[in-house]
């Protein structure tokens, strides 16, 4: 043990010496190093390879080219950079020169292309031909002459001079072996990186030609000039990259005619991206903008434009112009015969892709004859040159038709394979179509230039659209996520994946800009487009820097969260950052620059600011490498960017003081770099600044003294140099000291770098806090949208650099791997788990398992790592954890780190090729890690990685330095950051407590101490944040790697490039290679992302799913019969059955949906079609509802206008009445009393209204109170939920950590028990050995005592004992030899057996490998065949769906055709009947017309006679002095006229009778027609039943159509009944008119005209029906179409049968394949069993061998111990013989005493040590037991708490579910109520319409009645006048005749009155007048009259006349107050026009 301790001390001393030598070399100057190198070169054993962390500083630049000579006779081979180490090459890398002689010739074409798959994947086309030029292009030599340029291509000879000391030389290990005789172990060759495609073929293989897309069609538009004077469109000019027919790229100026700012619709017909071609027929492509504007201005009222979309926007324009709104796409047109023939010819030729190393080529697979080709081979013929090749089946892939070249969705490809996808992407990229759907994801190819597909006008083309309606675009992803967020109210996240430089940051900026533009912000404008642009500018300046792969690469990960309110507007926003490369400020790879903000600041044009920052004079050297730009244009651009940055800060509300503080910190970092750091020579190596004047400037800017700054940087470096990490949980208590030997010292430069990185980290954290302050808001947010942008995959080899990747690049690659893993989990694992939960069986045989070996190699933790022990456990751990463990081990280096890493994850013996995620590199301290499932191999350089675990005290001192600053501006920054952090944390405490805990605003604010475990924690927080939302993935692919092939852009040209600048600068290298695409690189990215598997799963699976209840609620509108059957609120016990009924009614294809246990699943696109049908149905219902609403509103408006008109008329009449009665006494009394009554009524009403208002107010207050209480309860519950969630998270984390600690303690306890058992075993062995030694010692003592006694007694006895002893020794020797011989014989036999077993094992291993290779080939073939079979199945399902749709259309067409036939037949029969009726009615009408004409003539004559008679009567009445003869003549004429009138009345009665007879005949004919119609309907019903029996599939549809027909028939019958009622009313009125006197004949004529009009209308209808009736030719055409459709249907049925036969064949093939597969699996299982048996036997043999070896070793050890014992005994025996004579008595006592004492002392020491160890182990065991018990109790308490929280969460979830269900029921009741209200409104509208028609009829009748009454009034007035005139002439008996005639007229009137119905006021008035006439007649009928009576007669006649005319006047005059109270006067005169007329006459 002491020896082991001594060896450990020696080893530690050796390590310490090496360490001191290394530090001594680091302290050496450059001159000393050069001299040491020259000395070592002279001695021949130089092997200098310093790889310090400041390697870039020790390397020197090449100032002049090195003259290299070529030896005569030697050949020079300049090959690619990716050649192996055994080939001659020249590698120049950042000042390094590596030379290697070509040892082997390059043999074969295959050997010339051996290299890294990454370099080959980054190439486009063939390999670079001019390698020397490529090598030279990677450097910018400061001086280059024309003479020296020729020397760059030479190589040094073997005997050339030593290299120049200005150049650091790295020689290969082979040359080192030659130069030195030392046995330096040469590292093993670099492992081969697995390649994607390696095969080449002996033919000219070319990629398919890029077929240019057909140019978009030109559109001609004619725009009218608007009232504002313009045409409503804007003119925009720009430059575009285009390709000439010869293939050259050039720029041209184009003009766009786009909709104006105020035009948001398609009224103009223009869309964004329309290129202006012609104006008014003149081409304007080559005209200037002024000329075009002048041409538009000179146009008249209209202008004709011809426009054409640009290729980038052709898809968007097509999809937008298909409909008026662009929200729905039209179905594609049917294919023509030519297209179908072309596709058939394509598929018959069996086109395939031949996959080779450079890409793929199009070929035709030839049908080989039997046995002409070996198995697994096919024969193909290349299309471009006709070469015929025999290739493997795995080298060909199915090709799609040319129509699939530019599909928008890769999931629509018929054959889904890598080559087809690459071909589609290549063709789309060549057509400037950068976006492509890949199932649910989006694939974006980063453009080399700036495409014109991103603008605000293009954004509005996506607003409000569904995903199915949008062309692939980054805006489509944003719209899809935004729409999903609004519909589901769930958080959404958009994750961008891809390599560095692939356009992720640009795409994320477009996403945020779209959301900010379309969603808008609330009233406070907390987040606008201007603020987002300012934020992007700020992040780009402080977080981006140029790299070898990207001109402005993002160097941090960020999550931009947009919070939305209830209205879908942005309420607030926040930015979270992590994984910032803060060390890039001071240290970064060669040829890369620092953050952009430093170059912007150094180019600042503000002299005042430069003076304040001391930047007027810049330093020549800067240890941080921060140098100003040299080119004037770069300086100008950087100055512009600085001004833009200042403007952005103002927009983000960053005050000038805060801006100034930022500039002060940045300038101080620059001055620190200029100051530098060194060790003072005369101050015992004290660290200090190299240039104190620059350090003084930095101290002044930071507000501290130079001593304080120096102390913060240099004087406390040992504080963190002890590997002390507060955030790491591996630190033991014994490692916390600050001793010199427990940690490594930090150099002065490292301390300075730590301060710079700390300052920049604090500044960046402060800026994020200020940004969040500007974006915060107090509004309540409902859900959020997160955009995740992380740095892409970093691979320096893709950028043309030979350096190894750094640790920061490893972190970024690790984050990308984690995001890729998240994509795989979301796409594959979650979907499969969902299918498994719902019991849906889907076979994904070709789906490879998801592997995350690269992730595990970085972050895999172990339980042993939690134990505070330095002992290495056998459990594998990741690189980050190994770094921390190795940092704790004294003397650990990067080499030991790599050894441990490769022992866990490196390739092991027996592993298959390509399974290991790690490979060794030929360079020292380098390794390769395979990212993206082994498709992206990155070489990492681990030099200096152990320093990342050291805690830099300067970094920790940076915040304290800012806090203690004397500058007030700088001092307030930390306090502001703390205040902002507290405000933000309080604002987001409710919803984002967990996120804030794990993912703060900036990762640097977690802790200022650095630990590698924080990298994993930050990425975990990022993943956890994303997992809580619904994810949308965008895959950004890199089309061509930056700098390969060709020259990479210099870092200086990219330092000031802004990501926001989209215009391509002139001279960009991408112009020469417009839209180039590297197929190999794209294949690597495509295979690494596993997009093909995702698309295949998307196609084969059921990506869309919906819960049963939600599906029924959403789509029951498509099945109204189910709604009528069950009602809208129906609740069924079996939801699944209800959904099945709904699916059956929807008539979906069976393969398009699948029923699960709780939800229904749909194929891709099925749910979208259902949504489209639902939208159409909803639109139809809404249209009808809107029409009903508008009709109702119009009717209400019309009714209101009628009421207003009536009110106006009433008011006017009342005013007139008021003028007449205002002076009457009763009216004055009325006007005095009426207001008093109204006042009382109004007071009562006001009191009632006040009470009602008070009640409503109380109710409102109560509702508001309840609402506030509910809101408070809701907020309290939300707060409680968030607190419980956070507590649950904390408890869960605590439980996880406790379980980890418990597991760790358990493992440690087991390990301790194991060690204790081993020690116990050793103790027992030692104890046995000690007992055996004791026995031997005792025997020796006894023998010695016996010998001594024997010598005393007898000398002969000693000889006897000696002989016995010698004999025993000989026997022992013989026994040992015999045992040794037997052991050797057994060993030989065992070795022979082992060799046989090894040979057998080798044979079996070879057989197993061969079987594995065959199995892998069969698996690949099976997977390929399965994929092709799945593609065929999907294609077949698509065809079946299409056939199903065609069958549905055919059935619908058949039903419509049969219905048309029935309608035609019915119309024909009705036409014939109506024609017969028409003829009869025409004849009757003609006869009636003739009769009416005759009567009209007679009436006209009579009218003339009446007029003449009236004239004569007038003359007679005016001439009172006429004689009796003329009076007699008049009387005679009067009697004649009366007779004629009687005759006319009789004739009119006869005509009325004839008209009545005609009406009866017409009614009879109508009844006959009705009976015939009923008979015909019965016949048709029988025919319908026959048709239903013949067409069972159409029975449901026909019943619906019959129901509609019956409803129409009932409506028609109802109309006919109404018509008959009107006709009966008309006949009744005609009878009434015929019974009137001759004055009412006009009414008869009107009725006759109306009858004629009705007949004319009937004639017109008959003519219309006759003209519209289909002809026989049309019926024949319909029959032909029917026959053609039946023939088509039969053909479709045949095709379907043929497809079914093919399906059966395919099923048979599948069965054969399955059988073969099962046979192979059985064979494989049999081989596996044999292998297992052999392996078991080998293990048993190995165990036996081990036992034998153990026995052999034990025997050898025992023999050696026996020999040693025998030698000791022999020596003791000799010694005792010599001393026997001298000290016999004294020797025995002393010897026994000494030996006893020595033995007893040794035993006590051993026992004491063992007992101490046992006590120590028992103590540790008791402590571990107590710890275990404590942790178990803690775990039990945590479990109880978790169970309680789970129960509370379940209860709350149940309550929420109940509330949701109640809400759903209320919503359904509300919908039902709305539907009932709409039904009532419809019924009310129908009733109002009928009422309106009746009112119109009533008004017409009343008007006719009024006209008749007016005629009667006029007649009676004339009679009165005639009576008054005749009274003076009645002196003879002739008066009696006149009186008799008047009496007869009165009698006739009385008769006619009795016949009339109704008793109006006018009739009573007429009756009064008739009574007056009767009284007059009675007075004048006396037998004798005296002459004295004449005067009385004359005097009394007028009085009686006026009394008869105005009988009511006297009453009114007698009692005016009573007349006021009459309803007739007080009320009816306002509503009844007749009464008003009567009152007018009465008042008059």
Curated annotation (Swiss-Prot):
Domain spans labelled IQ: 1178-1207
Keywords for the protein's UniProt record, in alphabetical order: Actin-binding, ATP-binding, Coiled coil, Cytoplasm, Cytoskeleton, Golgi apparatus, Motor protein, Myosin, Nucleotide-binding, Phosphoprotein
Residue ranges constituting the Myosin motor domain according to the UniProt record: 405-1175
Amino-acid positions noted as binding ATP in the UniProt annotation, renumbered to this chain: 498-505
InterPro entries for the chain: IQ_motif_EF-hand-BS, Kinesin_motor_dom_sf, Myosin_head_motor_dom-like, Myosin_N, Myosin_tail, MYSc_Myo18, P-loop_NTPase, PDZ
Record-listed Phosphoserine modification sites: 35, 52, 72, 74, 83, 98, 102-103, 140, 145, 157, 160, 164, 234, 1057-1058, 1060, 1630, 1932, 1960, 1964, 1988, 1992, 1996-1997, 2010, 2026, 2031, 2033
Family under the similarity heading: Belongs to the TRAFAC class myosin-kinesin ATPase superfamily. Myosin family.
Function: May link Golgi membranes to the cytoskeleton and participate in the tensile force required for vesicle budding from the Golgi. Thereby, may play a role in Golgi membrane trafficking and could indirectly give its flattened shape to the Golgi apparatus. Alternatively, in concert with LURAP1 and CDC42BPA/CDC42BPB, has been involved in modulating lamellar actomyosin retrograde flow that is crucial to cell protrusion and migration. May be involved in the maintenance of the stromal cell architectures required for cell to cell contact.
Name of protein: Unconventional myosin-XVIIIa
Organism: Rattus norvegicus (Rat)
Organism classification: Eukaryota, Metazoa, Chordata, Craniata, Vertebrata
